[in-house]
Every structure is written in C-alpha cells, then in structure tokens.
Amino acid sequence: IRQIAVHRFRLKSFLCFVLITNFVAKIKNKRLSMKIEQQLQAAVIEAVKALYGQDITPEQVALQKTKKEFEGHLTLVVFGLLRISRKKPEDTAQEIGQWLKDNTSLLQSFNVVKGFLNLVIAPTQWITLLNDIDADDHFGITKPTEDSPLVMIEYSSPNTNKPLHLGHVRNNLLGWALAGVVEANGNRVVKTNIVNDRGIHICKSMLAWLKYGNGETPQSSGKKGDHLIGDYYVAFDKHYRAEVKELQAKFMAEGMNEEDAKAKAEKESPLMQEAHAMLVKWEANDPEVRALWRKMNEWVYEGFDETYKALGVSFDKIYYESDTYLVGKQAVEEGLSKGLFFRKEDGSVWADLTKDGLDEKLLLRADGTSVYMTQDIGTAKLRFQDFPINKMIYVVGNEQNYHFQVLSILLDRLGFEWGKSLVHFSYGMVELPNGKMKSREGTVVDADDLVAGMIAQARQTIDEAKKNTDMSEEEKQEVARIVGMGALKYFLLKVDARKNMLFNPEESIDFNGNTGPFIQYTYARIRSILRKAVDAGINVPDTLPTDIEISTKEEEIIQHIADFAAVVRQAGKEYQPAAVANYCYELVKEYNQFYHDFSILREEDSRKQMFRLVLSKNVAKVVRLGMGLLGIEMPERM
C-alpha cells in the first residue's frame, strides 16, 4: 500500500511538473496566432493572479497604444486594478511589469509613469507575430459558418424611370463595402435590392413615351434603356412645368394670388391627372398599361445590369415593389381592422404616431393606391418569410431617417417582433460644386458617364507617366479600369458615411495623398519588388528566424499590420467601411516612408533583406484584403 501511495505521489508530481512546464512554455516560447495585445492580456491576468491572488477578466485589462512622448509600444493602465493590489499606482505598475519581464518573453523592458505601465515589446515577439500573420492568407478575416448570424443588407433601390446617378453610386458602393466588412466579422450576408418599379414616377415616363416617343426603342435610338426612359421622365417634367405655368397665369388673371394659383394649376394639370389615372389603371391590372410597363421596365433592367457590372456590385436577391406592395396593403388593411390605424373621411388610411412623439403617417391614399411606406411594410414581411434573418440593414440616405423610424414603429405595432431591430445605415448626400442633383431637371452626374470618365482619366494619367511601355493595349486598358474604379470607390468610401460630401473627380485620381491610386500604386510597387526578388533568386524561408535585428520603424509597421484585425472588427461593429479605407491609406503611407529610408533588394545583409521582403509581402497582403472588402481591386502592375 505504501509503495502504491509513493507511486501515486510521484505520478501526481510528474503530472504537475508537466503542466507547469507546458504553461511556462506556452507563456515563454510558443508561437501564437493571437496578437501581442492578446498575449499580454493573458499574461497580465496571470500576473495579477500570481501577485495578488485574485482572478480578473480580460475586460479588466486596460491596454492601449503607448503615447508617442513615452518609450514603449503598449501601455497598461493599472488604476482599475488598485482595489485588487491595495497598493499605489506606481507600485502596482512596477510589480506587474517586473512579473511580466521575469515570467514571459514578451518584454524587452518596461517603464512606469504614475499609473501607466509602458511596455517595450521584445524584438523577437514582433518577428514571431509577423510569421503568424504571414502564415494566415486571410489574416484579420473571420469566415462565416453555417451557424453564423444571417444579416440582410439592402442597397441600390433604384427607380425604373431613370438611370443611376452619382447618388446611387455612393449607395451601391457603401452597400457592397458594408456587406464586405459585416461578412468579414463572421456573419452570413444576403445582399438584396428593392426595385421601385411602380408608382406615379414610373407612370410619368410611360405617359411621356406614349405622347412624345413615336415608338422609340433602345435599339432605334442607340441609347441604353435606362437612359432612354430617363429622357422621357425629364420630358414629362418639362411639359408639366409649361402646363402649370400656363394654368397659373390663367388663374392669376382671374384674380387668384400667385401661391393659390400655382397650387390649383398643379392639381388641375391635365398631364398630371393623366399620370394619376394611369397609376389607377396599373393597380387595376389594366392589360395595356401593364404591357407597356413591362416593356419599358425590361429596357431599364438591361441598362441597370450594365451599370452594376461596371461598378462591380451584385445582389443575392432582388425584390420588386410590384410584387410587395399588395402584401403591404394587406398588412395595412389588417391593421385597420384591428384598430391599429384609422381611415379619414376622404377614405385614406393613416397611422397615429403621436404617442411615439411623431405625427400622423399616410399609409393608403384616398383612391386606394399605396405609398412608399406600404411597399416597405410588404417587402419587410416577405423578406423575413424568405430568410431566417437575424438582422436587417437598410442602406438609404439620411433624408429618409424619419421614414425608417416610422417603419420600425409600424412593423412592431403590426406584431412583427423583428420590427424594432431594423438598422437604418443612414448616409449623407453627394453634392456637386454647383449644388444638389435633381433628376427631373436632367442635371445629374450620370453613373455610366462617371465610370467612363474615371477610366478615361486614369488611362490618360497612365499614358502620360510613360511607364510599363511593354504593356499591351489590353493590359493598359485593364489597369486604367482598375485604377479609375479604385479612385472612384475609394474617394466615396473613405469619408464617414454619415457626412455629406463633395465629389471631385480630379482630386480622386491623384496618385499622391489619400486616394485609391496612391494605395494601388504602393501595392503594385511591392508586387514588383517581390517579382524582382524571385528573378534574382532570393530565397525567403517559410518562417523567419526570430533573432533578426530590426529597427523601430520596422516594428511599427508590423504593429500596424497587426492592427488590421481590430480595424475590421471596428468597421463591422460600427458599420464604418471608412475605417478600413483609411487604415489602408495610413499603412501604405507608413510603408512608403520605410521604402524611402531602407534598402530592400540592395540590402547587403541577407537576413535583413529576407525580413524586409516578408514585411513588404504582408503589407501588400493586408492592403489587398482590406481594399477587397471595399470592392476595390489591386493591380499587379501600374
């Protein structure tokens, strides 16, 4: 029995030794895929346990980047730990710093400034971190699984009475980029579009085409279908304005004041009355009206498809208002029967939202026709029937803030439990130097013209540079497309989405400063360096030795690369694609300074040379991943 007890004791001692040895190895030597901050966080938790005998959570470890005026990479703020240590801030910081220095290989040194523990990370840790990043082709990206939350994102939402314009371009690019960062945070994403293919605005184009079109088609005119229909929307407005002006003058001649005369003229305009009559016929399923509507919409869809392809956006599911508005009308009628809404004397149906601090909201007109709110209720209901959505995000301009506030309340009132969880990704308007865009006046920046102009401007810049003269014509045009579209996308995405912005094409195509072409040029430069290294027979190992001597600037770049994962998380959490855009710019700006100050291919120390090649390779990788989330392509050559 005594021998068995001795053996058991020895076995327990051995197991304890193994566990302790493994723990120390894990803290000291093991290469971890975690960022250094996460490793330090785990080590601080262990230090507090060892020093003060208490467990703390990761949230209690307050790490931040060290301010530039102090020595260090990361700073631990210890004030939140004083109740545990029961010591002065300086003493607590000193003890934790010394424990980390003695028990881990993370630190080269540390210093204490009051309650701030400034940590200088050991150079070996930076190279270990770079090796981990280098081994991960999708660093910073969390791929969704079958069980991941499902997020639906609606963007684009065009009307079929006009082509897409600059405002639509910002919407589409924001929607695509938002989908990218949300998916990169481990969510399944369904990209969706609601096409406003019915309503009075559609009838205006249809009526104008009947009156003034003479059977014109996209084929006979040589125009894209969306542009052709847009011309007739403008034509309707032109004739309507002339009609109103004539009627207003008539009513004023009869003694009516200017304001009342204009209101009466707009109401009694024969052209507008015909458009409303056509809308009523459409909702009554009139065969002739429906046939014309289908024909003209098909022209528009073909045009839209070309524009979407040029912008590099697509959708997983497209809804059409003509399919959803009846579902919305039915939901409103059911709400009316339950006393949730009320009918006015003229027959229109309204929602009283005064108890919610809002006003009354029209849901059905007196003639029974629906409004945008009716359609959105129906579309939301269909979407949640079609998909097990965990979250619904609408990418719509900030002029619709009130609309989505009301939609959320109405859906909740109708008993749809997901109503209050809707997210309105509200963004600012794109303005021109001469003011806002108005499609009814034909004074818009057309999306197709904008895309063509950006590509042409990029091509001109490339030709003037007279570089890569060995490129074929096809290659030059492809680079021009990538650069032109990159300039457009980056310029629109780098700005906080909530802000209004002024679009300047010339500024966006600049190869210097905070622009897409500047980032693309840096990427192409790195790819060129890597190709030259291969041609020169320079071999780079899969794993860098950790004892290579590196500079402070190189440490900073590794830290900047490692920040990518946190930036992606922030962008997904806060719905801010601009965070990724500006991160990419700051990274390439820092790399360009490094490129200016340090030799790479001409470096005589082979160990430093291979380190800098791996560093450059991973700058390019992270930039490609980040810009890819935004829908921006990277050229291999420029």
Model regions: which residues?
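Charged/polar low-complexity intrinsically disordered segments
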Residues: 3, 12, 26-28
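Non-catalytic interaction-recognition regions
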Residues: 22, 33-127, 145-638
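Flexible, low-complexity linker/hinge segments
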Residues: 135-146
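Short, charged, solvent-exposed linker or helix-capping segments at domain edges/interfaces
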Residues: 128-133
